[in-house]
Amino acid sequence: MHTSSHRRFNPLTGEWVLVSPQRADRPWHGQVEKAPPENLPSYDPDCYLCPRNERAGGARNPDYSSTFVFDNDFSSLLPAENPTHAVDHPLLVPVYERGICRVVCFTPRHDLTLPELDQSTIESIICTWIDQTVELSAKDFVQYVQIFENKGALMGCSNPHPHSQIWGTQYLSNEPAKELEHQKAHFKQHGRALLTDYLNEE
């Protein structure tokens, strides 16, 4: 393995990334954030995502006992058509983006994160992700479904109750679009899947 500065090629994106292993020897090892509180309650009456509580948008959660899915009250994307106003400047071109943003509460428990759940509960969450992906993909304007989880305030998570988000978007996001194109090019050139080749190399 290289021990000095070098650029490494990312075959999924076609980009070169600077790698500087020698910087691991410097005395500063990065910002250290405080660990989240260890003794969270199983139910928090002030939590927007706990069962029976009122959400920030005014709706009240049901008394759910497994996963709970709802459209995000403060969605980054909206499903209604709302064409972008034309801008007569080549450097300021907007493109309207439709989408659906949903929240998936893993369980009613405020204090249990995904790795702390039992296998059957995790399987139930995965089945919910699959069902949501199928449902969103069936909408005529949805071209891409992304499932993700933000962990901690530093990553933009506004609520500690364990949950993920699912976005169904009208267009393929930049990173997945690049990855798709490079995987197509690899298959066309070699007749094999890029990720399978990478796994075999590992």
Q: Where is each model-derived feature located?
A:
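HIT superfamily nucleotide-processing domains
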Residues: 1-202
